[in-house]
UniProtKB/Swiss-Prot annotation:
Cofactor field: Zn(2+)
Native source organism of the sequence: Francisella tularensis subsp. holarctica (strain FTNF002-00 / FTA)
The keyword Lipid metabolism appears for this protein: no
Gene: metG
One record GO biological process: methionyl-tRNA aminoacylation
SUPFAM superfamilies: Anticodon-binding domain of a subclass of class I aminoacyl-tRNA synthetases (SSF47323), Methionyl-tRNA synthetase (MetRS), Zn-domain (SSF57770), Nucleic acid-binding proteins (SSF50249), Nucleotidylyl transferase (SSF52374)
Role summary: Is required not only for elongation of protein synthesis but also for the initiation of all mRNA translation through initiator tRNA(fMet) aminoacylation.
Database matches in PANTHER family: METHIONINE--TRNA LIGASE, METHIONINE--TRNA LIGASE, CYTOPLASMIC
Cellular component GO terms held in the UniProt record: cytosol
Compartment annotation: Cytoplasm
Subunit relationships: Homodimer.
Taxonomy, superkingdom: Bacteria
Broad enzyme group: ligase
Matching PROSITE patterns: AA_TRNA_LIGASE_I, TRBD
Stated name of the protein: Methionine--tRNA ligase
Amino acid sequence: MRKILVTNALPYANGDLHLGHMLGYIQSDIWVRFQKLQGNQCIFVCGSDTHGTPIMLKAKSLGITPEELVTKYSNRHLQDFTDFEINFDNYHSTHNSLNKEIVEDIYNKLNNKNLISKKAIAQAYDPEAKMFLPDRFVKGTCPKCKAEDQYGDSCEVCGATYDPTELINPRSVISGQSPIQKNSEHFFFDLPALEKNIKDWIESNTLLQPEVANKLAEWFEQGLQSWDISRDAPYFGFAIPGTNEQKFFYVWLDAPMGYIASFKDYCNKNNINFGDFWGDSSSESELYHFIGKDIIYFHALFWPAILSSTGYKTPTSVFANGFLTVNGKKMSKSRGTFIQARTYLDNLEPSYLRYYFASRLTSRIDDIDLNLEEFVTKSNSDIVGKVVNIASRCAGFIYKKFDATLSGEIFDPELESEFSKNHDAITQAFEKREFAHAVRLIMALADKANQFIDYHKPWQLAKEEGQEQKVHQVCSQGINMFKVLIAYLKPIIPSIVAEAERFLNIQFISWADAPKFLINHKIDKFKPLATRIEKEKVDKILEDTKKMFENEQAPQSKKEEPKLDIAAECTFDDFMKVDLRIAKITEASHVEGADKLLKLILDLGGVTKQVFAGIKSAYKPEDLIGKHTIMVANLAPRKMKFGMSEGMVLAAGDGKGIYILEPHEGAQPGMRVK
């Protein structure tokens, strides 16, 4: 039995949850439920992130205390999680004496190791609001990629981190005024001193997502900087000891420690030894943090550094998920697609969204699109039309004609074996968080079950004299195939499975038993387990969302919707001049002095070409060797200061990532792409 501790990013307690939040929590909940069915001791903790200037200012605007604000939203968050069937073992808060004790203890340990220093720095100060501005209360143009409307600590376009004072054309989010600079003494964590600790953690982490590893390599190349862990009063949070409550711990220092506090609280309530799960690195337990891709910096750099230097186990891995779009676009209040969790729950059952997200989720950090038309179609087709329909087609015959008892024989052992043989592949897919693959395997089995029923037509057999035994066996096999499918789906749609368990008179408590057929087993009367989604329900969600936000103040400047910038039209003859070929990457290496380039040696089926490709931020050289890609083979050679580039590899990009093109299996080096 494995000992596994899972955390999910703490939601910020100054607003309601939306479906973008739910994507990450549903992902982790599915994985945790699967681990528990495997018989592992898996503990799932979370809590509310409750500190910082945004909470302080929002509470002030509402005429309530910050404590009242965070209590209100913490309760609402927990209710949303509960109704979405996110089954935390403990839900805590960062604003309590236990977390304060942990934060101060870790700070003192860091300070005793000379990892904390003080220095005066220029801070953004709002002269109108008469206060220092936290990072997220300054916006401007990114100093690295020049993207506009970026926060004062990091760019959401290029991922760069910086100080608010480095922003181009900065403005205060509070007053809209240009901030001035004032000096203030701040406390810094010496991150560069722990670079080896972080790199050792990365090297030992076999489960780290490639995208995370690549981003970390990029940050190391840029050089680590000491981290400002303090904020000036006024601030809602924990005061730094010895500062007379004039300096406070930055929210991103105490927020991850909320994971420790939540788990300690759980241990205290359940008489569990904290050290068995989160002791030093020698512990045999596993620790996983599920997070959004926008907070990788804090969880994969600062957090392992802090833990490794204060006697705590470092994460076994950090799993990041992408963002959510709706109908191919960023969630929008005006279009009604900025859907809050409660708005969805007021109109639809959580199982449908849990299933849809599972059908799209992989182990990669891909953004997920909630296509509402596809959402309706997939829910109706897969859950209702394929899975639940199997039971509804067979249960009546068993209940009425055979005393609600399944047959003592298996009608089609070969088909039964196929359901059983897929168990290992489905297990591996769940373990590796390849939920979309697991769903595809399960639905392929559902198709086979429905084909079996369609072929034997028990409704016709029931009308034929002497076919009673066959009707019994066919329908029993149908119910058993339904039983296997529903067991495989338990981590994804637990409430529907709970209803199915009542109908089947069993409880799935062991993943190993999922593929086993029931023999001479008595079932209950079948009742509908899921109903079809009507388009009107989805339309109402959009309308409810529009109404919710229609009274909000319109933004100061409206951004244009992104448009597909198609290049000038070319003729077919022009296009045919471009010679695209399959190429195998035989060598890949860094280019000394180049920030973005990798040197590739490409085999075109006997012909070798050298290419310099601007893909360094997305790929490690060793990960590219042996891959096939597509290159422009007849591009005129170009002399660069690093050498001669004899072509170009094809890649796609959206400003956030780079993705080289890979042909399907079977394509060989030198083949022409037409």
